[in-house]
């Protein structure tokens, strides 16, 4: 109900603002904030909003007396341009000075009454006609209220003026307003122009008994309305002409033994005035002389300190206490059932209590009182249920309230088709069995959802005979008036907490994904920030930064880029072979590296070398000792070859480990000593022995350096060693050579042949052997 009302407030235009005004008005009228909060949650903490065209509103616990300390509120919302008309059927609110204790408030009112419409007392108020398309209603009972007033019951209808026609069960006023048919000729002007009370030949449709104020009762057989005080009811004297004030009176003795299978009894102060100065204690023993169950129904009017105890079995304490009832159960009927056919009822009342005791009826289950009809029957052909052991009286027939679990008391009513049931209040509306007890109102007053003995599938049956949705069961919020929907629930986490946890985990997971995405994005941007601004010059600069390390000092001398210096080591044959192997491996590695680079990389490399590097020998052309000349010998496969057609140059000086002097700088031979002559050819210079030579091929041979006896003469000949002249020129052995140093080799060569390529290389590398 509260959930449905909240949903209705969202759909109504301006409903929230109007609800705020309602709250402020209630605070102003009651003077307490604590009274305003329950008012917004009408009667048991529920807000009741009405948007139906026709409906019925009544006070809490109707038709019983309303409880003290109650705040209720209702809100009727119409369409734009609608006029809302309210007519009171019953009205009994405890009267006080200026209606300061208990009151009913309606607003906004029509001109000339602009202020709120505040009511109390027992007289039927005039019809209320709204000035706008909405009406708010407040009901308040003070905590000090006696609780002896019945309350009110009103009907309303909304619509526009100037209607051309009305529904079949409605009456059209002269001003075009449509009213329910029973409102015609009821002595109350609901049309506003008096047209509903004109030409009335029949008496008012309301029975005269309904016009008696609270605290009185009518004489049912009187031709005119006569209301008597309740103290004269069942006092042993006939005050009504037909004796109706003494008809059907219960036994008012203070306790006795009852032996019939049905009967009734009441406390002595039920119809009496205020209790005397002494306490009252009465006990009733009920013995139906039957082993079947016995049903007990009580209507309580207890005072603040009064109470009733019901026991199963006979005796002052009985066998088992069934229930203890206090004033809190005053305004609702109480039904108890004993497993045996015997009951004990004990009543305790305080002196000068404001209560009026109780009225009780009992019967064996399955039997009905003489003036009642059974809900069940011997067969279910007439609409009854074989298992329904309830009863109903003739006034309860077709009153819109189910007194039988099978609904037999509401079947076959003349106002509805055979397969439908009437709504409460005589509105003429009907509903089907499928609309019964499904937590969805089909009647304006919700009669189809009251006194439910069973519920439709998908709903839960409350202890107060109401039905709610099954999903509202154990959701942490009491939706039944007795809170039975939250009883027996497991100690589980409420659904709201689970929903909040799921939403929170989803949000946290989403934030984690976003954080990881940002981290990966930043990492990607940092790794790509240089590539994002890459140009031709940046690529060339990167290539320049990644160039190979410059050659060492020894490699520069070996390549002939710088002249030899003193004390630089001399390459022996074994060292030259190792160096040649290293160079060959380097060339292969460079060729392999060049094969991986694309043409564009090679072109960029050549362009960079031309722009920023001074000319130098290609990588593959590495001279052994000195810069390349036409007659220079380049180390190819371990031997020196002269270039063809070139003039024979003096042989390149062989370097020893201790000195870098050339052979031509040898000191002259000793004077007077003839030069030594080799086996064939001119005589050897002074200080040299005949070298030991061995042929390598047809044109070349290798000679071991002859032993040097002394420094060579300065004028020693510098003739190259050849096949015809096998005497090589050698350098002087260094004095720094140790005894284990390898002996230098002299290489004899023919005139150098022309240079020709020996090995395949890349585009920017040239390997020539001369």
UniProtKB/Swiss-Prot annotation:
Keywords: Coated pit, Disulfide bond, Endocytosis, Glycoprotein, Membrane, Receptor, Repeat, Signal, Transmembrane, Transmembrane helix
Annotated S-S bridges: 43-72, 99-120, 166-178, 173-191, 185-200, 212-227, 219-240, 234-249, 254-282, 416-430, 423-443, 437-452, 455-467, 462-480, 474-489
Membrane topology: Single-pass type I membrane protein
Domain LDL-receptor class A: 165-201, 211-250, 415-453, 454-490
Residue ranges occupied by any CUB domain in the UniProt entry: 43-159, 254-365
Cytoplasmic topological domain: 518-770
Signal peptide, first to last residue: 1-36
SUPFAM superfamilies, alphabetized: LDL receptor-like module, Spermadhesin, CUB domain
Glycosylation sites: 71, 199, 359
GO biological process: one example: negative regulation of fat cell differentiation
Expressed in which tissues: Widely expressed. Highly expressed in skeletal muscle and ovary. Expressed at intermediate level in heart, brain, liver, pancreas, prostate and small intestine. Weakly expressed in testis, colon and leukocyte.
Membrane topology, Extracellular segments: 37-496
Region Disordered, residue ranges: 635-770
Function: Probable receptor, which may be involved in the internalization of lipophilic molecules and/or signal transduction. Its precise role is however unclear, since it does not bind to very low density lipoprotein (VLDL) or to LRPAP1 in vitro.
Name listed for the protein in its UniProt record: Low-density lipoprotein receptor-related protein 3
Encoding gene (name): LRP3
């Amino acid at each position: 109900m509260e959930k449905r009302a909240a949903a209705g407030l969202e759909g109504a235009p301006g409903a929230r603002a109007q609800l705020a005004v309602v709250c402020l008005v209630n605070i102003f009228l009651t003077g307490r904030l604590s009274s305003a909060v329950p008012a917004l949650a009408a009667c048991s903490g529920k807000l009741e909003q009405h948007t139906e065209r026709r409906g019925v509103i009544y006070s809490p616990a109707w038709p019983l007396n309303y409880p003290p300390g109650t705040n209720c509120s209702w809100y009727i919302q119409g369409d734009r341009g609608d006029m809302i008309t309210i007519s009171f059927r019953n009205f009994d609110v405890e009267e006080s000075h200026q209606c300061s204790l208990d009151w009913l408030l309606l607003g906004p009112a029509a001109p000339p009454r602009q202020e709120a419409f505040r009511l109390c007392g027992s007289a039927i108020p005039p019809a209320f006609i709204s000035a706008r398309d909405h009406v708010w209603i407040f009901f308040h009972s003070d905590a000090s209220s006696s609780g002896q007033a019945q309350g009110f019951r009103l009907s309303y209808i909304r619509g526009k003026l100037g209607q051309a026609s009305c529904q079949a069960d409605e009456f059209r006023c002269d001003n075009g307003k449509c009213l329910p048919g029973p409102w015609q000729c009821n002595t109350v002007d609901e049309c506003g122009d008096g047209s509903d009370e004109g030409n009335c030949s029949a008496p008012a449709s309301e029975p005269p008994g309904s016009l008696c104020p609270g605290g009185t009762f009518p004489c049912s057989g009187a031709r005119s309305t006569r209301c008597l005080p309740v103290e004269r009811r069942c006092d042993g004297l006939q005050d009504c002409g037909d004796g109706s004030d003494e008809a059907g009176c219960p036994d008012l003795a203070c306790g006795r033994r009852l032996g019939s299978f049905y009967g009734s009894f009441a406390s002595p102060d039920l119809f009496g005035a205020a209790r005397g100065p002494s306490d009252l204690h009465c006990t009733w023993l009920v013995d139906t002389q039957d082993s079947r169950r016995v049903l007990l129904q009580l209507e309580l009017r207890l005072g603040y300190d009064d109470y009733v105890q019901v026991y199963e079995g006979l005796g002052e304490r009985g066998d088992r206490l069934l229930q203890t009832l206090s004033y809190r159960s005053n305004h609702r009927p109480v039904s108890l059932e004993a497993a045996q056919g015997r009951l004990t009822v004990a009543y305790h009342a305080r002196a000068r209590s404001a209560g009026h005791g109780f009225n009780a009826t009992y019967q064996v289950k399955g039997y009905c009182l003489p003036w009642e009809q059974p809900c069940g029957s011997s067969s279910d052909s007439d609409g009854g249920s074989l298992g329904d052991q309830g009863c109903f009286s003739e006034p309860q027939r077709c009153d819109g309230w189910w007194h039988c679990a099978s609904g037999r008391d509401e079947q076959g009513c003349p106002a509805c088709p055979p397969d439908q049931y009437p709504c409460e209040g005589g509105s003429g509306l009907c509903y089907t069995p499928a609309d019964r007890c499904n937590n969805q109102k089909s009647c304006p007053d919700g009669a189809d959802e009251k006194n439910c003995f069973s519920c439709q599938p998908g709903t839960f049956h409350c202890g107060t005979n109401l039905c709610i949705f099954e999903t509202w069961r154990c959701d942490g919020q009491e939706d039944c008036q007795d809170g039975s929907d939250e009883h027996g629930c497991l100690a589980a986490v409420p659904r709201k907490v689970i929903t909040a946890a799921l939403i929170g985990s989803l949000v946290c997971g989403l934030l984690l994904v976003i954080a990881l995405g940002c981290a990966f994005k930043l990492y990607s941007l940092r790794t790509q920030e240089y590539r994002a601004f890459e140009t031709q010059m940046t690529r060339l600069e990167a290539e320049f930064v990644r160039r190979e390390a410059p050659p060492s000092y020894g490699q520069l001398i070996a390549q002939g880029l710088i002249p030899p210096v003193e004390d630089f080591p001399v390459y022996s044959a074994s060292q030259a072979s190792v160096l040649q192997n290293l160079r060959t491996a380097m060339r292969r590695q460079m060729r392999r590296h060049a094969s991986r680079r694309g043409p564009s990389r090679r072109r960029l490399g050549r362009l960079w070398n031309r722009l920023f590097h001074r000319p130098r020998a290609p990588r593959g052309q590495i001279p052994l000792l000195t810069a390349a000349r036409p007659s220079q010998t380049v180390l190819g496969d371990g031997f020196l070859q002269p270039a063809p057609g070139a003039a024979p140059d003096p042989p390149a000086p062989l370097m020893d480990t201790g000195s870098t002097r050339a052979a031509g700088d040898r000191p002259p031979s000793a004077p007077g000593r003839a030069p030594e002559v080799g086996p064939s050819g001119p005589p050897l210079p002074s200080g040299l022995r005949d070298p030991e030579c061995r042929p390598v091929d047809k044109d070349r041979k290798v000679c071991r350096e002859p032993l040097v006896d002394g420094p060579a003469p300065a004028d020693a000949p510098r003739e190259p060693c050849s096949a015809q002249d096998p005497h090589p020129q050698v350098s002087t052995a260094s004095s720094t050579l140790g005894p284990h140093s390898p002996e230098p080799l002299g290489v004899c060569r023919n005139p150098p042949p022309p240079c020709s390529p020996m090995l395949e290389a890349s585009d920017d590398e040239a390997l020539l052997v001369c």
